[in-house]
Amino acid sequence: MTDLHYRCGWVALMGPPNAGKSTLLNALLGQKVTIVTPKPQTTRNQIVGILTDDDAQTIFMDTPGLTQVRGRLSKTMIQAVWQSLNQADIIMPVLDAHLYIRHPEFLDRDLAPVAQALASEERPMIVVVNKVDLFGDKSRMLPLLTRLHEMWPRADIFPISALHKDGLADLVELIRKKLPKGQAQFPEDQISTAPLRFMTAEIVREKLFMHLRQEVPYSVAVDVESWEEDEERGQTVIHATIYVARPMHKAMVIGRAGQSIKAIGTEARKDIQELVGGKVHLELWVKVREHWTEDTAFLRDLGLMAE
């Protein structure tokens, strides 16, 4: 029987790098569906997370951070953002309050072009002001909130802390009210559209970001080459290759006496076991593939570029 009051729709999370979009999505779902690191520009693909309750199904799209385009990979990531916007019923920019209060001059640099591009939008828009937990004196936020109202006069401006989950229940309620009426598009127990292989590769990439310094994690890619169920041993056997752009990066990923790759593999295996709900045997290999970020065919093979 069709529920005429049920709501269902797509919400595009967008904004500058390191604003907390992925942290917010994981917090809204109460489960990890996208990787989170302290480094900006971690997300490369559109990640879909699904929140279902008795009254609504909200389909969130976590997108790469909006930044200046540098190279084919970066261009592909920015294209993913605008493709998500075309699909969205609600547009939800997410920004780092702490950054813009400390550096108000960055506000027009980062957000004015986005506000201008969306000026004619008639779809609902919620501007999420994240990381408000970093301010004891909330009055310091008033100039920022005032400027955001000027930039997005029709939008709801909503302060939250994704890390501490402050304000999230009210945010979910606001989103639900703005969703169009319609029936659920996914089963009620599904929380993401990402295949297990993709999520496994993302977990390995997250650990690379956590262990490697400077520019190295930005020049690595992970490809899960095989996935087999070993019923005799009761485990999932996964072979993944880490591609790096330079020989020196390979040495850094492996580490002295293999200590770095061992730590990356151990931490990744624990998260993958939680993901699959069972024992995992993970083997990681490191290969050099120079200029892979400019290789269109390779980017397509990795799922980083549409066919």
Curated annotation (Swiss-Prot):
Residues of the KH type-2 domain: 212-290
Primary location: cytoplasm
Region G1: start-end pairs: 15-22
Residues spanning the membrane: none
Keyword Nucleus belongs to the record: no
GO terms for biological process, alphabetical: ribosomal small subunit assembly
Gene3D superfamilies listed in its UniProt record: 3.30.300.20, P-loop containing nucleotide triphosphate hydrolases
Stored HAMAP family: GTPase_Era (MF_00367)
The protein, known as: GTPase Era
Origin species: Desulfovibrio desulfuricans (strain ATCC 27774 / DSM 6949 / MB)
Gene that encodes it: era
